[in-house]
Amino acid sequence: LDAFAARAASARLAGRSLDLQYYMWHDDLVGHLLAREVYAAAERGVRVRLLLDDINTKGLDPALLALDAHPNIEVRLYNPFRNRSGVWRLLEMVQRFFSVNHRMHNKAWIADGRVALVGGRNIGDEYFDANRSVNFRDLDMLLLGPAVADASAIFDDFWNSSAAVPIEALNPQTPENLHRLVAALAHESADAAAQVYLGRVAASPSAQRLTNHELVPHWSANITVASDPPQKTKGADRRGWLQPRLAAHLDGMHREVLLISPYFVPGKQGTATLLGLARGGTRVGVVTNSLAANDVPAVHSGYERYRDRLLDGGVSLFEIGRHGPVATHGLFGSSGASLHTKAFVIDGARGFVGSFNLDPRSANLNTEMGVLFDDPGLARDLRQEYLRLAAPVLSYAVRRGADGSTQWLDRSTQPPQVLEHEPDTSWWLRTTTRAISWLPIESQL
């Protein structure tokens, strides 16, 4: 709710520009409400630049073309498909697999070059507590000051790269009538479901402080926004990539390394790094999704391959549960929750919040971005978030049994209950996930 309020408020207060960079912008309630805020800003004379990855825009061309028709709005798509719909788009995915497999996973909302929201959220109901079934727990950082210039420079690099193509150059169709689209957005924002959601946003105490300009910022001189380059996969030079920069933070001796990653596939190198830290006396902890909470079971299969090795090496693993008291409650009362936060904190002093999953896809295929900080106050807050996620009410502690089996400890009951298989899953889901783990697809996870 607060994340929605921050974006809506920044759009309403913008006077010059809105630069929006996202992997996904869903055709749903939240997507429509924020699109209406963007349109309203453009109507006031604000220049809007919207950069979306093209992998999830199927069926959105009419609406995007309509927005692009506004004189103050320009829409570009990253690494777009030449075929815009139907079976031809699917065939192109097969024919150009190695090319279209590289996606822009960045997420940034920048207003007037003065305020930036950077983190792990896409735009859609499940990212803003408005989904009836599953909502994602996610984390953003709201930035003011010099760090915003970093985010703006990253946006400009992507916007001006050859990978970002104006949507009007891709689709010869006549754009949907802008006035018709605006009328539809206005009608939806006035209906009962939208009003219930907007009422919940307005009732949030922190959202009220935000809109009343009562939030007190935390000032720090040690915050930077970092990103992969737009053409990440072109050439062998990895010096500008985000992954080596993040890995460098794990080098050396540490007291504590705490990781939060919804999609956790450490691979051989990452596993060796974490085990090396644990052997050296570092407390290493990881919070990730359980199989039941993971919306991509194939990714869980990649994690499963390394889980026992990490446990045997002294790494603490916690898996977020899906049901019961762990669930958040969206517009219609969601039945579950899934972790989507991507962050780490080291020695209670420095850390990262962004879009980077600890998996091969983030490391090698997608472009990613996030906020790096060296600040005990911010690190303390992020460490508290880790501890909250790892707490008994939200997650299962994973351990090895006396017989060498993998066990899940439900610490929310007294006495704690020991589970012998993946919690809240069917035999079929466990079996298919195990079968997927045998496939040579780790590089794509």
Where are these regions (language model features)?
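Charged, low-complexity intrinsically disordered terminal segments
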Residues: 1-107, 111-445
